[in-house]
Each structure stands twice: as structure tokens, then as C-alpha cells.
């Protein structure tokens, strides 16, 4: 037995015994399958609105606000959707489309087409005003117009078309800024200014009305084809879905892929 002092081994040093060499194949431990998976993708979006016209379209108006504003109007007051409500409703329609609802599919097609048309209208006005602003003498330099304190808003949408609605509103905000700039410098009249603003605002409100008038119904293509109670009730309320919508021939660019069960 070796002596130790203060925990230090004082025994004569010996080489450790080495294992005998072997000619057998080494044992290979089964490798654990490595899980190659990245984390969830994440992105945030914020926007600045510079004009009261765009901010009012973002906020919408409740029935009581509409009644106060239109006190002399003979029309009954109605609720005007806000952009967050439009985004939320577009998300609901998108999820119904994912669940194979042909009526939701039809509305997505209608909504996408309307957004394309309204976007073109707004962009044409922006281009027209931009050309007017360029008509000033070359010795004059105008800076881009913007609010000294814009409204900063965080935006989240569960559907691509919800974001397309937001892009449209941002385009209208740019339109309004350029229109007010052109009017401020005497390049357009007040009547022309109001005409441009009304044209752009109407393009936005058309999108709002499409989404606002949507009524959800729990039904699938199979319900329609099999004439289930849910399918018959939906047909009674909203009519027979378009054949091209049912077959999937006509769909929104952002719709999910049709499942085979749904008749694709």
C-alpha cells in the first residue's frame, strides 16, 4: 500500500496498464438521429400615417359617431369599419377558405380583385399629382411632404390580403400628402384637391364594404356536393356557389391548396 502525505500519492510511479490489442471490429454505437429544425420565423411591421384622411379611414366610425356627423342626413346611421376590423375579418375569411368553405373562397377572389382595382386607381392619382409637382420651375426645389408627428401603428394580419389592405391605405396616405402639397403651393384648385381625395377615399371604402358585408357560414364543398343539412342551409341563404369556385378553377392568389376531399 502506498503512503500518502497531504493528499499527494508518494508511491513509486508506474505506467498504467494498456489494454491488449484486438483484431475484432470496434463496436459502433447507434447514432441518435439529430433533429434539424429552426425556430419559428418572426417579423414585425409598423407604419406611419401622416394625414387625418388616412387616420380617419384607419379608425373608422361607430354608428353614434356617424349619426352625429350626418345629423341632417335622411339616411340611417351605419357603422363604418376600421382598418383593424377589416384586417380581422379578412383573417376570418381566410381561415374559412382554408377549411374548404367555397363562399369564403368566392369572397377572397372578389376582395383580391377589388384591391387590385383600387390600388391601380390610387397609384394613378399619385402619379398624376407627382407629374403636377414636377411642373414647377427647375430653380425651385420641393422636399417630400410629411407630418411632423405621424401616427405610428403596429400591424399584424393573419392573412396576406389583410396586409394588402394596409398597403392600399398607405398608398392613399401618400396620395393625400401629395394632394395637399400641390394645393398648398397653388398647383391645383380646392375643387381638384377635394376630387382627388374623394376618389382615393372611395377606393378604400369599397374594400371595406366588401369585407363588412361578409357573413360567415360553417359549410364545406363536400356539404354543398352531398346536399347535407349544412349545405342546403348555406344554399338557401347565399345561393349556389359558382361552379368555377367549387372546382377550384377560380381562386385567390393567396388561397390555400384545395384538399382532394374538397373535390380538387
Pin down the residues of each PLM region.
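Short, hydrophobic/aromatic alpha-helical segments in well-folded domains
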Residues: 178-179, 196
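Extended, well-ordered alpha-helical scaffold segments
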Residues: 193-196, 200
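Mid-to-C-terminal oligomerization/interaction "stalk" domains of large proteins
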Residues: 177-178, 191
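Polar/charged low-complexity regulatory segments
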Residues: 2-168, 174, 181, 200-264
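Conserved hydrophobic residue
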Residues: 187-188
Amino acid at each position: 500500500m502506498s503512503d500518502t502525505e497531504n493528499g499527494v500519492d508518494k508511491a513509486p510511479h508506474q505506467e498504467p496498464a494498456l489494454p491488449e490489442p484486438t483484431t475484432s471490429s470496434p463496436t459502433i454505437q447507434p447514432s441518435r438521429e439529430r433533429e434539424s429544425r429552426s425556430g419559428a420565423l418572426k417579423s414585425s411591421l409598423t407604419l406611419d400615417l401622416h394625414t387625418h384622411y388616412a387616420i380617419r379611414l384607419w379608425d373608422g366610425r361607430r354608428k353614434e359617431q356617424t349619426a352625429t356627423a350626418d345629423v341632417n342626413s335622411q339616411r340611417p346611421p351605419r357603422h363604418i369599419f376600421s382598418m383593424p376590423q377589416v384586417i380581422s375579418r379578412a383573417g376570418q375569411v381566410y381561415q374559412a377558405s382554408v377549411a374548404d368553405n367555397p363562399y369564403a373562397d368566392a369572397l377572397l377572389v372578389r376582395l383580391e380583385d377589388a384591391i387590385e382595382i383600387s390600388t391601380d386607381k390610387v397609384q394613378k392619382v399619385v402619379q398624376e399629382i407627382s407629374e403636377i409637382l414636377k411642373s414647377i420651375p427647375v430653380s425651385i426645389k420641393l422636399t417630400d411632404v410629411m407630418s411632423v408627428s405621424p401616427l405610428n401603428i403596429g400591424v399584424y394580419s393573419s392573412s396576406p390580403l389583410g396586409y394588402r389592405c394596409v398597403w392600399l391605405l398607405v398608398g392613399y396616405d401618400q396620395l393625400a400628402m401629395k394632394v395637399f402639397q400641390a394645393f398648398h403651393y397653388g398647383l391645383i384648385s380646392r375643387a381638384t384637391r377635394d376630387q382627388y381625395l374623394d376618389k382615393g377615399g372611395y377606393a378604400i371604402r369599397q374594400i371595406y364594404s366588401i369585407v363588412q358585408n361578409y357573413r360567415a357560414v360553417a359549410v364545406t364543398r363536400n356539404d354543398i356536393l352531398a346536399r347535407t343539412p349544412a349545405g342546403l342551409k348555406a344554399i338557401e341563404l347565399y345561393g349556389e356557389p359558382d361552379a368555377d369556385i367549387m372546382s377550384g378553377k377560380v381562386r385567390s392568389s393567396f388561397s390555400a391548396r384545395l384538399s382532394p376531399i374538397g373535390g380538387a
